[in-house]
């Protein structure tokens, strides 16, 4: 007995007689392609770890929401350019020692961490600048002002910006008004250790040797979060006769915690195996459709009502 196959006819019959199975095959094919693409994506792309919600990139980006006001009414504080002995400061390296437990970190008190960050000072029109050389800007904020939640939202944080060069009114006199200036500053944050992320830290700067000015003057600024602009008690003259400072942190890919390569390879393997299984299922169903075509009951019923049999019965 010779088996004669009509693949195209069988496939057409299968599609017309079994639409639900055809839709199922298309859906499974789409899932297989999606898993295959996703597996390739996990293999080739570095993925941010979902387990680590806060790293130093996200932490420093929080300061972008701050507005600092450098007012003419603030009192300047003069201090000497003296290097602080290493023994008198709790460094970030000590605070992040792997031998310390979380409880020990909480009991160690406030720590200082200094990182380089961009500070923009945008003087308003009435602002006339300072005759003294301003080398430091200092402010005190609370955790909720930079979007921290829970217990950290009530933590007090002292921020000090060390300017690489003195900021004074010399340029204001030359131009007739004070223009916007941009500094790459050394920002020192003093706060409880629980406020800081426990991930890889950015490169540190040394405030004591950052500025090249011989005389140091510090000015205290007030800070507010950007959400205050939309509050009902917003004061449009909040920084009248002052300069508005904005902090800007550029993303550093080295600070982002990524999924380890071994984990990504394992994810890729599972996704590939799943996609291969789905492809085999689709190919099997396709071969069945090519060989069998429409159901046998449907073929039998059609043969019973074929034109030849109808003609013979009429005769």
From Swiss-Prot:
Query: Where exactly are the transmembrane stretches of this chain?
Result: 22-42, 180-200, 271-291
> Which residues form each disulfide bond in the chain?
none
Major subcellular location class: membrane
- InterPro entries cross-referenced by the UniProt entry: TMEM248/TMEM219, TMEM248/TMEM219_dom
Note down the stretches annotated as region Disordered. Answer: 82-106
Annotated membrane topology is: Multi-pass membrane protein
Give the UniProt keywords, A-Z.
Membrane, Transmembrane, Transmembrane helix
Say yes or no: keyword Ribonucleoprotein present: no
Matching Pfam families = TMEM219
Q: Which domain of life does the protein's organism represent?
A: Eukaryota
Q: Name one GO cellular component term.
A: membrane
Bias (Polar residues): 82-103
Stated family:
Belongs to the TMEM248 family.
Name of the molecule in the record: Transmembrane protein 248
**What organism does the record attribute this protein to?**
Xenopus tropicalis
